[in-house]
Amino acid sequence: MSSPFLWRFLSFTQKYRGTLLAVSSVGLFAANISYHVAPEQTFRKLYQGWSKGEPVQLTAKLQGLFQEVLEETHMGVTSSYVPFSAFGFHPVSAGIPWLPSGCLIGIPFNYNDTEQDGVGIADRVLLINGKEVDWSSDAGTHLRQALNLSLDAQKFSLAREVFYAQGNSPIIQASAAPVCLSGICLSSVAIKQLLGLYSGPILLRGVYNMAVVVLGFAGYFLCSDAVSQWLDYQSDRKVAAVSKSYATGGIEFYEKILAQNRILRTLMGKQGETMYSPSGNLFPNDYLRLKNAPYTSRRDRIKNALLQME
């Protein structure tokens, strides 16, 4: 009984393959871009910082710092970028500036204190593997130093998120999946026709289709990761080109991230060894993918850019 259904299904997909490909591509793009289109309803709910059951409001100091970054980076319409207080220790962003919803930039609360203040985050409770970090211990002291950033490093990290959104990076990243899907489907059909597989045995076509699926996934992973890394490098390059202070801030920012990860690798034990490399880079979740550019590579590229500016 399944055979007639299978033949009807194959006939349907063969007849409407163009429409199915278009709908699938649009669906993939919509799924990947959804939280950038409505960041207030999706992204902010995930990253909003909370304290005592209430959302943490961004301080006047951080609002002033963010406006200063927008002015120094010469962003045209500053109202398109909306900052808010986010949890964590690094800035996050989502949204597209030219859309009505704009772009949200999440600024961590610890940015209220800088390396120059000498305060840092020692007054906050940080739990790692269910245990509170002792800020007076050697590991706690080094972690506190790694989490405290200078004003230049804070500016770099915020400008990086602004440039990432300003360059339409979310759209480019979301386009990788539908472009790969369309490319694989169209090329596989062309190769089938070229080799005459449509008139060949159905088993041979099945083996060919399975090979196309495997190669398609591998190609998507490589393409998506390459695009992601290129966007990371592009954002860093643009920010480093603003001024020498931004470039030096970028070097410090990535060095501090590497230092944080090395300390977390020690504090988290076996779990930390699976997440962070001895250098401080993130280990990929699987062996086939490297979604983000290594921090050491991003730092070294900024160093080279700084040398060219001198």
Swiss-Prot record:
It is found in: Mitochondrion inner membrane. GO terms for cellular component: membrane; mitochondrial inner membrane. Residues 1-17, 192-201 are mitochondrial matrix. Keywords: Membrane, Mitochondrion, Mitochondrion inner membrane, Transmembrane, Transmembrane helix. Residues 39-170, 223-310 are mitochondrial intermembrane. Its main location: mitochondrion. InterPro entries: TMEM177 (IPR026620). The chain crosses the membrane at residues 18-38, 171-191, 202-222. It comes from the Eukaryota. The keyword Transmembrane helix applies. It is a multi-pass membrane protein. Belongs to the TMEM177 family. Plays a role in the early steps of cytochrome c oxidase subunit II (MT-CO2/COX2) maturation and is required for the stabilization of COX20 and the newly synthesized MT-CO2/COX2 protein. This is Transmembrane protein 177. It comes from Xenopus laevis. The lineage of its organism: Eukaryota, Metazoa, Chordata, Craniata, Vertebrata. The gene is tmem177.
